[in-house]
Structures are given as C-alpha cells and as structure tokens.
C-alpha cells in the first residue's frame, strides 16, 4: 500500500508562481467627491483621510452595483458636495480657520515642575539609599 504523504514536499517555487498569478485582493471605494480609492483587504478597518474628510474602510462606503458590468449607483452624481455657504451676501475674507498659537509656557493642566538643581542633596541620598 502506498503512503498518503509524498516522499518529497511540494516545490516552493510552484507555490510562489501560483501566488504571483493570483489577482491582488483589494476593494474599491467610491467617495462622494468622485474619487475612487483601492485598498488591500488586509487593511480593512483602518480608515484614511482624503481631502480633509476621514473615511472608515467598513461596510458603509462600499461600491453598490446594479448588475454585472454596470456603474455604481452614485457614479453619475455631478456635484462635488453641498455648498458650504448658503448666504452669498455675507463677505468671506478668509476661508481658512485660524489655529491657536503654540505657547512656550507650561500647559494649564500641569503645574510648574521644580528644577532638579533646586532639589536638596539629602533628597537624592534618601532616594538612592
């Protein structure tokens, strides 16, 4: 009776060749702005930011097909999103929101820490003895 296991293991080269021929498993995400992004299936759940908008790679943004070769449902959307300013009568001088300046002082939640030079020598002796 022949053994069920081969005498030599299968060649790793053959497995590598087959892996190269396999299609890369990736998923397409069509965004509201009209852009399409592909990501590897191993990256699912990490999310990304595109044009200042954070997108999660979960089930809500997947491409929805009508049939085998038809376009996604929202592909024919002409606008690039809603208009931000509805009232055009208000003048807009600066469209960039100012950011708070960085300070060199201590944060308000942390008190000022004393300098290590001001600590008494007896403290260090007691600490390391």
From Swiss-Prot:
Residues 1-20, 73-118 are annotated as: Disordered. Pfam families: Gemini_AL2 (PF01440). Phosphorylated at Ser-109 by A.thaliana KIN10. One of its GO terms (molecular function) is zinc ion binding. The zinc finger and the transactivation region are involved in PTGS suppression. Strong activator of the late viral genes promoters. Enhances the expression of the capsid protein and nuclear shuttle protein. Acts as a suppressor of RNA-mediated gene silencing, also known as post-transcriptional gene silencing (PTGS), a mechanism of plant viral defense that limits the accumulation of viral RNAs. Suppresses the host RNA silencing by inhibiting adenosine kinase 2 (ADK2), a kinase involved in a general methylation pathway. This is Transcriptional activator protein. A zinc finger (unnamed) spans 33-50.
